[in-house]
A protein has these predicted regions:
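Membrane-embedded alpha-helical signal segments
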Residues: 1-219
């Protein structure tokens, strides 16, 4: 189940972000405490949590007390009060309108947030080159006239990483590369190039941040 959820997550991220994140490896580590999992990005720990393979995690959406027997804990992704309960208490938990999450989903949810927090690091030089190669099949002139005469592949990678760091999707790579070509004629500064790209993606960025009511929430 966990493996299938991770595959689905990678497909979802590819649709949303515009590139395929690296494969996720699952490994046993006997040095970890019991029931502990660790999520790493490039071999460096990014997050950890506790899991009960034979239990269910419940949370009360109202924030109130959860009147079911079990072990109190903290939901690992968002730090919410939670409780591990036996699987045979699922129906009772649902009847009480608690949120019920199985162990694979707990890990996948945590992994999703780790990916979002580290998107820029996950876009490698090789993946950037692949994106440009794929774009070159339909936009050959744009790619050949821009790279490497105006900007290098690593320069494009840095611009894309800047966008991902701001949770801006890079799906519309042709518009992004057009904007890079425009800006790089007058400046080699990657951050200034990114600013120009961001302005060209204004409609996309606004749409992505628009709520169901048609308004963009401001804090």
């Amino acid at each position: 189940r966990l493996t299938e959820q991770i595959k689905a997550l990678r497909r979802q991220m590819a649709r949303e972000l515009g590139f395929v994140i690296p494969a996720v490896r699952i490994q046993d580590n006997m040095q970890l405490p019991p029931n502990t999992y660790v999520l790493k990005v490039k071999e460096i720990e990014a997050a950890r949590g506790d899991i009960r393979p034979d239990a269910l995690l419940i949370m009360n959406p109202s924030g109130g007390k959860m009147d079911l027997p079990g072990d109190d804990t903290t939901e690992p992704t968002f730090g919410l009060p939670a409780k591990w309960i036996a699987e045979n208490q699922r129906e009772e938990a649902l009847f009480r309108n608690y949120t019920v999450v199985d162990p694979p989903t707990v890990i996948t949810t945590h992994l999703t947030e780790v990916i979002k927090d580290n998107m820029s690091e996950l876009l490698s030089y090789a993946e950037t080159q692949k994106l440009l190669d794929d774009l070159g099949k339909t936009q050959q002139k744009l790619v050949s006239e821009t790279i490497p005469s105006q900007i290098s592949v690593s320069g494009v990678q840095r611009v894309l990483q800047n966008l991902l760091r701001e949770t801006v999707s890079i799906r519309d790579l042709s518009t992004i590369l057009e904007a890079i070509a425009e800006a790089s004629r007058s400046t080699p500064n990657v951050h200034m190039v990114t600013e120009h790209v961001r302005s060209r993606l204004a409609r996309q960025i606004s749409h992505a941040n628009t709520g169901p009511d048609g308004y963009i929430p401001l804090v």
